[in-house]
Swiss-Prot record:
Chief localization: secreted
Alphabetical keyword list: Disulfide bond, Knottin, Neurotoxin, Secreted, Toxin
Subcellular locations according to the entry: Secreted
Propeptide residues, chain positions: 1-2
Descriptive protein name: Conotoxin Cl6.14
Cysteine pairs bridged by disulfides in the record: C17-C27, C20-C33, C26-C44
Domain of life: Eukaryota
Tissue distribution: Expressed by the venom duct.
Annotated organism of origin: Californiconus californicus (California cone)
Lineage: Eukaryota, Metazoa, Spiralia, Lophotrochozoa, Mollusca
GO molecular function, one term: toxin activity
GO cellular component, one term: extracellular region
Amino acid sequence: TVKRSSKRGWWGPPSNCWVCTGFNKCCEHESHCMTFPTQYNRECK
């Protein structure tokens, strides 16, 4: 299922959307994903 991201874009992933591993966060690129406090809690930079 495709869910609306709490940030921007879509969890899917369409173009411009990188799903951060371990959490359904949608970022523009993998390098925008950051981890805190564990690898299962990710947000966009």
